[in-house]
Amino acid sequence: MELTPSEADLSGPTIRDSTAPEGLHFHYADEAKPLATPWQVAVERAKMVRKCSLPKGIILDPACGSGIQLAAYCAMMGREGIGIELDELTAHAANSNLLRVSNHGYDSALADSRIRIGDGTIADPTLKVAMLHLDPARPRN
């Protein structure tokens, strides 16, 4: 199942990330908040990667969780992204976070990004991937 930000539900509860700009709140599913990458860390990573020359293609996060890191990459690099999340509630939260970041004035590439509910360890040979994000803080996920 694939989710797009245009279909996101923003009505659920949100939590403010103290490192995010004023008014930018995020959705989390169940116990996902303690695992979420803080916005400031996500943006700094994206700024570092933005300095690199990447080939054409998407940003792929095969274990996207709340989607905050994926949203930061797409926002800062102006690239479409695909996040894959095994847990359905967390995937819906990630999709809502893509829309929230897009609505906060970041790059429109977020609107073209999507979240897939599924197993990120199963490759999709149709994707042209410019960058694969694997969170170094969670090497076993």
Give residue ranges: language-model regions.
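S-adenosyl-L-methionine
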Residues: 1-57, 87-126
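A generic secondary-structure signal
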Residues: 44-52, 72, 97-100, 104
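Conserved beta-strand/loop positions that form the S-adenosyl-L-methionine
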Residues: 62
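Conserved SAM-binding loop of SAM-dependent methyltransferases across substrates and taxa
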Residues: 66-78
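Conserved SAM-binding motif I beta-strand of class I
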Residues: 80-85
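S-adenosylmethionine
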Residues: 128-129, 133-141
